[in-house]
Amino acid sequence: MADWLIGIIMGAVEGLTEFLPVSSTGHMILTGHLIGFDDDRAKVFEVVIQLGSILAVVVIFWKRLWSLVGIGKVTDGPSLNLLHIIIGMIPAGVLGVLFHSAIKEVLFGPGPVVISLVAGGILMIVAEKFSKPSTARTLDEITYKQAFTIGMFQCLALWPGFSRSGSTISGGLLARVSHTAAAEYTFILAVPMMVAASGLDLIKSWDILSTADIQLFATGFITAFVVAMLAIVSFLKLLSRVKLTPFAYYRFILAAVFYFFIM
């Protein structure tokens, strides 16, 4: 298959699934297997196109991101600030640094991914069932305690297949944060976390990068960026109506497909 076509297919899958609670890792592994793109080059490619998805968040939430560093203000009252982000980053950041190699060795495999797809779906159903009325209906109403709780749930995203947005939005619901506010906080929180993780992976895989792959990487990056932009905007509109439950059932179906096609 031509590199440009691989770039478009994989970039579209990455952009569509990175910020939906369905596990981008599971979809990328399955798609790569189906089109025969699952070698060492594919692993570096996934890191590069993930940066395209991150750029989409930066473009959509640029006013928020500027306000976090003291440039501009989105509201006259109390608002989300940099400390909210730092607090949310600490749990997964510490865990990721301490156990990065162990996580890569133990959890990056077909079996663990299938288990996490199911476990993540169960968590989402439980969160919907037992969540109480929201005390933080908007992003600016999130407390430091709620930010830390969401950060704790983000640790689950270190397990491939669990889904960053699925785990953090579920944590937000259990901490009495509304669906939309939890999702927006999740996306903003993902920027520093994903940049750090992707940067680390790129450094470790630097010797695999080649100028011969520029077309592949560029096509995938641009496709992931465009599709992620559309996916994020659509998901935020959809979330207020359909909640997490349909995504949970989809994860169960994906786990079955993954089991029969990959394992």
UniProtKB/Swiss-Prot annotation:
| Keyword vocabulary terms for this entry | Antibiotic resistance, Cell membrane, Cell shape, Cell wall biogenesis/degradation, Hydrolase, Membrane, Peptidoglycan synthesis, Transmembrane, Transmembrane helix
A GO MF annotation of the entry reads: undecaprenyl-diphosphatase activity
Cellular component terms, GO, for this chain's entry?
plasma membrane
Catalytic activity annotation: di-trans,octa-cis-undecaprenyl diphosphate + H2O = di-trans,octa-cis-undecaprenyl phosphate + phosphate + H(+)
GO BP annotations of the record are:
cell wall organization; peptidoglycan biosynthetic process; regulation of cell shape; response to antibiotic
Q: Which residues cross the membrane?
A: 15-37, 42-62, 83-103, 106-126, 142-162, 183-203, 216-236, 242-262
Q: Which InterPro entries match?
A: UppP
Q: Which Pfam families match?
A: BacA (PF02673)
Q: Where in the cell is it found?
A: Cell membrane
Q: What is its main location?
A: membrane
Q: What is its EC number?
A: 3.6.1.27
Annotated membrane topology is: Multi-pass membrane protein
**Similarity remark:** Belongs to the UppP family.
What is the annotated role of this protein in its UniProt record?
A: Catalyzes the dephosphorylation of undecaprenyl diphosphate (UPP). Confers resistance to bacitracin.
Name the PANTHER family on file.
Answer: UNDECAPRENYL-DIPHOSPHATASE (PTHR30622:SF3)
Q: What else is known?
A: Bacitracin is thought to be involved in the inhibition of peptidoglycan synthesis by sequestering undecaprenyl diphosphate, thereby reducing the pool of lipid carrier available.
Q: What is this protein called?
A: Undecaprenyl-diphosphatase 3
Gene name, Swiss-Prot/TrEMBL: uppP3
